[in-house]
């Protein structure tokens, strides 16, 4: 069983979008996938409910409930945890202890980047992170590669002690897919294949570290 925690202290960074598409990827691969929704908005749960009829359904579990771990089926192969919005390192201890890797989405603006620093500093106090026994990867999200702002943001992220493991472009495709309970991995159109390619570095990193 592999567990991936998706966390960010900054609201609107794309945490749930990253979580749902990641869960869909593993489900499309044929793996028994659970999405632990620890965000009080429960947008990830609603996404799971919309695809419950599919062969690639993802089982939602309420991560805000007491003893939520007991609801994880024994045949689960992959767990994706959508962390609570605005949570700092100390608030994530229960999820961090389960995680095999952590993904942190960051938007391409100095305000968002600066807001992420205290979060990463708080996570660094965790014993597993401090001892480098828990891999942490940054994901540049909603990037517009043709703009100076996005290019500068990526360069700034690369100067941090954590690896930039992926760069996801700004596109309405994610908004449309989430509304349908789908992901960019559920279709084989040429347009969506280009978005799938954006995920290759993230998936390669996860395969390497867990």
For every predicted segment, state its role.
Residues 84-166, 170:
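Conserved catalytic-core segment of NTP-binding enzymes
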Residues 144-210:
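Conserved GTP-binding G-domain of TRAFAC-class P-loop NTPases and closely related GTPase folds
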Residues 3-9, 13, 20-97, 178-185:
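P-loop/Walker-type NTP enzyme "switch/lid" segment
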Residues 11-12, 41, 110, 144, ...:
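Surface-exposed, flexible loop/turn segments at secondary-structure boundaries
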């Amino acid at each position: 069983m592999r567990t991936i925690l998706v966390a960010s202290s900054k609201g609107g960074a794309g945490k749930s979008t990253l979580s749902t598409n990641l869960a869909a990827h593993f489900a499309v691969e044929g793996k028994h996938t659970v999405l632990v929704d620890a965000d009080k908005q429960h947008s990830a749960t609603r996404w799971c409910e919309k695809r419950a009829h599919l062969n690639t359904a993802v089982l939602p579990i309420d991560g805000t409930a007491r003893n939520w771990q007991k609801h994880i089926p024994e045949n689960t192969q992959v767990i994706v945890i959508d962390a609570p919005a605005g949570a700092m390192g100390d608030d994530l201890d229960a999820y961090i202890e389960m995680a095999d890797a952590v993904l942190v989405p960051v938007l391409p603006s100095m305000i968002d980047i600066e807001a992420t620093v205290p979060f990463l500093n708080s996570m660094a106090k965790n014993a597993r992170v401090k001892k480098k026994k828990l891999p942490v990867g940054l994901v540049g999200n909603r990037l517009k590669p043709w703009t100076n702002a996005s290019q500068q943001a990526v360069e700034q992220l690369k100067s941090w002690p954590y690896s930039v493991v992926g760069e996801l472009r700004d596109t309405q495709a994610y908004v449309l897919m989430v509304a349908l309970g789908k992901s960019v991995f559920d279709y084989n159109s040429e347009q969506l294949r280009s978005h799938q390619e954006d995920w290759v570095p993230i998936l390669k990193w996860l395969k390497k570290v867990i």
